Every structure is written in C-alpha cells, then in structure tokens.
C-alpha cells in the first residue's frame, strides 16, 4: 500500500460518511476509520467493523486497547472485512484514554505494547501498524523514543505513523495537545535515518501539504488531519501530486449531487445529519458560503 498521503483518524470526523466524501475527491489517499476501542466491538456494537464501503480502499482500521487477547479477537473478526491494514493507536492524549491506559499512555509501557502487537500479528493476515507521538510528558524524545521504536520493531512492526509532537497527558486537553507542544519535524526525519528499514509517515501541523511535500521527501509519507477535514476541496489534486495519476476533476456541483444521492440510500436520519455536517468544509472559503 502506498502511504504517500494519508488522512488521519479523527474522532467524530472520519466516519464512513466523511470517507465517502473524500473518495469523491481522491482515489489513492489512505483513509483511516475513527479509533474504535476493542471493548466497543466485543461487548457493544459488532457492526462497527462493517461501517465502510468497498470504494474506500485503501483503508486502515484503527483500534484502541491494551489487552492482547481482546485485540487478537478483533483482528480475527476483521479478517472477514476488506481492511488493508490494522493500526494500534498509541498517540491519543484524551483524559479518557489516559484513565483507561491506552492510546498515548501506552508509550510508557512498551512491554504491554509488544505483547499487543505480537497478538495482533499472530491473528491477522493484514499489515499491523502503530500511530505514536514523540513521547509523553517528560519523556526524553531522543534516547527513549529510539528505544521505544526499536522494541516495537522487534515484534515485526514496520509501519509507524508519527505525530511530531509530545503528548502532555496531565495538563493539556486533546485540542491543546494538537497545538501547544512544539512540532519537531527534525526528530521524525532522524527516526528515518536511524531506522531506514521502517516506513515512517509524518503527522502534525501540515497544512500547506502541496508545498511541504518536498520538505518531507526523505520520509515515506505525510498524514493530514484537521486541514483535510476543514478544507476537503484541496484533496482534489492529491492523486496527481502524490501518486502521478489523473485527478477525478469532479465539479463541486457533481460532488454535492453524488453526496445527496448517497444520503438517499441511508435509512437512519441521524446518519444523514452526520453526513451533512461533514459537507460544510466543502464550501469553506467560497464567496457567500455561510449563506
């Protein structure tokens, strides 16, 4: 799978409706589900794994959790679905994640992460990857990050999505954790030099991605989050700029029509409302868009 351009997993953002919209704009960008905790699948709604469309590939299922057995069970279940990759979230900084000891909190427990990753790989034929931060709280982002990457890679993991910031779990909100900890792109680039056999995709604060593409050329890809959600029209030129194939070149009116045709297939009124919310960004920056 070519990870040159990826759209980050975002809670309440990257659901199947937004991903359907994105596929009107780019065929090749790698899409992620929202993070789904293993318990919500095993003890809640098992249909969560079925919330995608065949047109979405390439698509990555992102899981949250810290129990090898639970993760292995969900990986077994995911074998019945057409996901291209399964990603373990080790970067989410929310208080709920911290109290549950998953997400970024697991960066302080590499031995648990190792057991989880071994279990996932033993129970899936799909690529298993991780999404991490540079560290958490007072972690040293030099030696401790290298040690963490090495320990995870020893399990056979080859694909790392790296948010180029620390996560401050005790003092900052998730929103502040996306903005206040300083970006350190140089540290991510050094990871690639130190671990050339690993696939390193950079994430965090990348807004002008067409012009920043050259800045990250030594890495294996870039991952965009809020910018892609807020201004999805910019995604129309991803395929030509990052993959060397023709863009879809759909007009705004065609995209809008396709989305409303899709909405008509939805049986749940709440699903339609969610889908309409995701469309707001299509019109950002256009004259009279707020009308």
Please tell me what each predicted stretch does:
Residues 29-30, 85, 159, 221:
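Short, Asp-centered acidic motifs that coordinate Mg2+ and/or phosphate
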Residues 1, 5-6, 11, 17, ...:
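Alpha/beta catalytic cores of nucleotide-metabolism and tRNA/nucleoside-modifying enzymes
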């Amino acid at each position: 799978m070519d990870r040159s351009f990826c759209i980050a997993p975002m809670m309440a953002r990257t659901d199947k409706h937004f991903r359907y919209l994105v596929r009107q704009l780019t065929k090749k960008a790698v899409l992620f589900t929202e993070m789904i905790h293993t318990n919500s699948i095993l003890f809640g709604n098992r249909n969560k794994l079925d919330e995608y469309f065949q047109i979405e590939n390439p698509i990555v299922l992102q899981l949250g959790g810290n129990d090898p057995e639970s993760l292995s069970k969900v990986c077994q279940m995911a074998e019945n679905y057409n996901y291209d990759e399964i990603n373990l979230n080790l970067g989410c900084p929310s208080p709920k994640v911290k109290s549950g000891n998953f997400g970024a909190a697991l960066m302080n427990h590499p031995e648990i992460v190792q057991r989880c990753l071994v279990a996932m790989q033993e129970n899936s034929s799909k690529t298993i990857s991780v999404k991490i931060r540079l560290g958490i709280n007072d972690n040293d982002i030099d030696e401790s990050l290298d040690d963490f990457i090495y320990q995870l890679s020893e399990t056979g993991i080859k694909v790392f999505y790296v948010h180029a910031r620390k996560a401050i779990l005790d003092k900052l909100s998730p929103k502040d954790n996306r903005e206040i900890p300083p970006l350190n792109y140089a540290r991510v680039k050094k990871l690639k030099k130190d671990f050339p056999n690993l696939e390193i995709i950079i994430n965090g604060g990348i807004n002008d991605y067409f012009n920043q593409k050259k800045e990250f050329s030594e890495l294996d890809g870039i991952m965009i989050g809020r910018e892609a959600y807020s201004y999805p029209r910019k995604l129309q030129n991803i395929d030509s700029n990052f993959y060397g194939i023709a863009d879809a070149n759909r007009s705004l009116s065609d995209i809008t029509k396709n989305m409303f045709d899709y909405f008509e297939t939805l049986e749940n009124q709440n699903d339609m409302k969610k889908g309409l919310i995701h469309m707001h960004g299509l019109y950002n920056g256009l004259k009279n868009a707020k009308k």
